[in-house]
Structure formats: C-alpha cells, structure tokens
Amino acid sequence: MNTQTDDSAFIRACRRQPVPSVPVWYMRQAGRSLPEYRATRAGMAMLDACSHPELITEITLQPVRRYGVDAAILFSDIVLPLKAAGLDIDIRPGVGPQIDKPFRDDGDVAKLRDLEPGDVDFVSQAVGMLTAELGGTPLIGFAGGPFTLACYLVDGGPSKTFDQTRALMYGNPELWRLLLARLTAITITFLQVQVSAGASAVQLFDSWAGILSPEDYRRGVLPYSKQILAAIAASGVPSIHFGVGTGELLGLLGEAGADVVGVDWRVPLDEAVHRVAPGKALQGNLDPAVLLAPWPVIEERARDVVRKGRTAESHIFNLGHGVLPDTDPDVLARLTDLVHSVPTGSEGSAGSAGPAG
C-alpha cells in the first residue's frame, strides 16, 4: 500500500472525496497508439514484455510522461498470472489468448496450481521501481476477473459469445465452482502482490461478463467477484470494477464491492448513476471511437461526459473501453488537458460542478 498518493485527485475521487478537477486516465493508455511503445516492444512477444521489470516500468511510464494523466496502470496482461501458475497459455498476434487444450473436466482444472508470490516476483520488482518513479502519482494494479479468465480457458481463445463457457456454467455447476474458486485464489494473490509492492488502487477487468444475463451473473460470477474485492478492501486500497457491455449488470458490479464502477460507452453516466446503488464513484465513459473524429466532436462529447458525470457522487474520466491502436496520441494529450481545465465548481463536493462550457 502506498500512502504517498492518498491526497492525489485520483485516489480522492475513488474515495468520493472533493477534488479540484476531474481526474483522468485511460484504459490501454500504454499501448499500440504510442510510437514509443511500439519501439520499446519491437520484436518481443506480449507475455515476454510483461515479464521484464525494466520493460514493464518503461512502458507503464510512457503515457504518464506524454499525457500528464492522473494515474498510471501497470503494463501487464490478464492471462499473465495463469502463465505464471504453470498453464501453457500464450497470446497470439492478431488473435489473442490461446490455449491448445480447452478446459472440459476436473483434470483440466487440476492443471491450475496455486499462484505463489515468487511466481510473479518480476511484477513486485516493477511495481517497486514504478512507485519510486511516480512519486505522488498513483499506480493502478489490475487483474482479469475470474469469469473472463474462465472464458479463455474453456473456449480456448477469443469468442464473441463464449458458448462453451456458458454451457459449462449451466451444465456442470460443480466443475464451474471448482474452476472459478481456483481462478479467484490466483487473482487474489496476483492483486495482493501488486498492492504489497506499492500499487495505490486496483482495477478488476471482467471484460466478458456482459454476455451474461443478470441472474446468471448473480449465480455464477458475483460470489467470486465479491471475494476478490473484499480481499482488496481489506488491504486498504480502493478498487474499480469494469466490464464491457455490462449496462444491465451495473447494479451487480456495484454490489460486488468495488469503490468505483466502470461504465462503458453504451450507458450515459446520468443513467448509470440510477443503476448503481449509492456509495460508489463512477468511471468512464467516452466512446473510444470518438477519438477518431474531428476535434470539435471530441470536445463536445467529452464535455458531455463530464457534465453527466456530475450526477454521480464522484467521477473519474476514462474511455468506455481501451484506447484504439490508431488513436492519435496528440488527441489524447489534448483531451487530458481539456478535462483538467473544466473545474468541478466546488471542492466541497466531488460530484458537483458548474457548467461544462
């Protein structure tokens, strides 16, 4: 836990405390949209790049230097802890995470051993290096949610609907519970390693949870998300919970226990505030594709997000998903400055402000 960042705008917003301006960071802010990222990672596989402390540190810092965002997010990948726990999984360029033999029975689940902190010592080293470099700028740790990890293991790779995963959840609930429990334990260890090394907050990405109905999410996923987020709460750092296409699940994402609920671009923030129980900050939610439009469109849409974010108890500006690879970095720099320039109007309320302009 890093107390040096407690008074930063990002951490204060996570805790629904007053801030002078809306804090900003971007999912996938360290990624293919940056020329320096492409140069740093040239010729290196993703999971290899995520295993070198110096490389993790450099890539994580790149968007902080370029954009002046209010938080860094650790450069890693959601399947990294699975690889570290001994699973033969890889990220294939242009495809995504792949496993040669998808999980179907108890024997497959038995391949997943517990994750030991020493398995990801390179992550601890990188976090230590980053917190020394970042000073008062918070570092966000992260992990994939257990449902999303299960999707890759059961379907064997990316899919739009993850039919095999849902079929397993419906048809073999005992095996499903065994798999999710194992993934939950791995995720908790991975996040605790990051927090112990100095991460100021964490984000749980359950990227594919939006393919589930609310009732299926409540039965098959929510108990495990609650367990992870309770473990993080006990460590004393704030947490963010996000998934794509989760408009119908926003209330349940909040119920899972995070301090901040991430909202994708499909649900306006002034609508999301009614779907999430009181006591939560909201994060989001500019459509990433808007950044490919002319600047007047970007400015109008960004100001609208800030305006609607004022209806929440607290708001962290972000995109509704990750930065697209062909996004112009200069546009992100300009967007960051724009959001920072809009005053909240009163430091007595994290979620109120004057006109957006």
Regions found by a protein language model. Give the residues of each.
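N-terminal basic, low-complexity leaders that serve as flexible interaction/assembly modules and, when applicable
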Residues: 1-93, 329-347, 357
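Exposed alpha-helical structural elements
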Residues: 6-10, 36, 108, 164, ...
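Short, basic, glycine/proline-bearing loop/turn elements
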Residues: 38-50, 105-116, 254
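Intrinsic-disorder/low-complexity, polar/charged segments
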Residues: 52, 102-105, 161, 294
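A short acidic, glycine/proline-enriched capping/turn motif at secondary-structure boundaries
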Residues: 78-81, 96-97, 105-106, 146-148
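Short, flexible, mixed-charge acidic loops at enzyme active sites
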Residues: 87-100, 152-163
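A gly/proline- and charged-residue-enriched helix-loop-helix capping module
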Residues: 94-132
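Active-site loop segments of alpha/beta catalytic cores
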Residues: 119-348, 355-357
